C-alpha cells in the first residue's frame, strides 16, 4: 500500500482503494498531543510489503539512531537485555477505522488489531539489545520501515515487574 499526501494534522490521507467493507473517517484538523521524535530507526526494509508482520529476536540487526539532545538519555540503557521500542508508523493511513486485514470482507475495528493502520499509528516492539555504541543501539526484533521515526525507548517491563497471574475464571456479579 503506498502512502498518500499528509493533511494539515500530519495524517496520511488514504490514497488506495478501500477493501471490501472497510470504512474510513474524516480526520480532525488539530490534535491535542505533541510528540518529539527522539531519533530514527534503521532497518533493511524499504517497503511495507517487505516488512515482516512481527519482529523476531532472531531477525536482522537494526539500529536505533538517537538524535541530540536526547542521546544523553541513553545513560544506563546498556544494563538491559531487552527494550520496548515505540515508533511512529509514518506511512500508515490514519483514517481507516474498520479493516479487512486478509482482504476477505471480514471486518475488524482498528482497536482490535495490531495492524499499523490506526488513528494514532504508534508501533511497539520488544527488542533484544545486541550493543550500545555512542548515540546508537543495535537491536534485533523490529518490524518497521527504514527511516521510521523513533518515539521512545523503555526497559522491557516484563524484566522488572512480575506478570499478573492468569485468572482461572471471570464472572460478573449479579445485580
Swiss-Prot record:
InterPro entries: TrmO-like_N (IPR023370), UPF0066_cons_site (IPR023368), YaeB-like (IPR040372), YaeB-like_sf (IPR036413), YaeB_N_sf (IPR036414). The keyword ATP-binding does not apply. The keyword S-adenosyl-L-methionine applies. Coiled coil: none annotated. It holds the Pfam family TrmO_N. Keywords: Plasmid, S-adenosyl-L-methionine. Residues 35-165 form the TsaA-like domain. S-adenosyl-L-methionine binds at residues 52-54, 90-91, 114, 124, 145-148. Signal peptide: none annotated. Belongs to the tRNA methyltransferase O family. PANTHER family: TRNA (ADENINE(37)-N6)-METHYLTRANSFERASE (PTHR12818:SF0). This is Probable S-adenosyl-L-methionine-binding protein VirR. It comes from Rhizobium radiobacter. The gene is virR.
Amino acid at each position: 500500500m503506498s502512502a498518500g499526501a499528509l493533511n494539515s494534522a500530519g495524517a496520511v490521507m488514504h490514497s488506495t482503494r478501500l477493501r471490501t467493507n472497510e470504512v474510513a473517517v474524516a480526520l480532525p484538523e488539530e490534535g491535542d498531543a505533541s510528540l518529539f521524535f527522539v531519533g530514527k530507526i534503521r532497518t533493511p526494509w524499504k517497503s511495507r510489503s517487505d516488512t515482516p508482520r512481527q519482529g523476531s529476536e532472531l531477525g536482522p540487526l537494526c539500529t536505533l539512531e538517537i538524535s541530540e539532545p536526547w542521546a544523553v538519555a541513553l545513560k544506563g540503557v546498556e544494563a538491559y537485555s531487552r527494550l520496548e521500542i515505540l515508533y511512529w508508523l509514518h506511512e500508515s493511513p490514519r483514517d481507516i477505522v474498520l479493516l479487512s486485514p486478509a482482504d476477505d470482507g471480514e471486518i475488524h475495528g482498528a482497536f482490535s488489531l495490531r495492524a499499523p493502520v490506526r488513528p494514532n499509528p504508534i508501533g511497539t516492539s520488544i527488542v533484544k539489545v545486541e550493543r550500545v555504541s555512542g548515540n546508537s543501539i543495535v537491536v534485533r526484533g523490529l518490524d518497521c520501515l527504514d527511516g521510521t521515526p523513533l518515539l521512545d525507548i523503555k526497559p522491557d517491563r516484563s524484566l522488572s515487574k512480575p506478570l499478573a497471574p492468569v485468572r482461572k475464571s471471570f464472572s460478573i456479579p449479579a445485580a
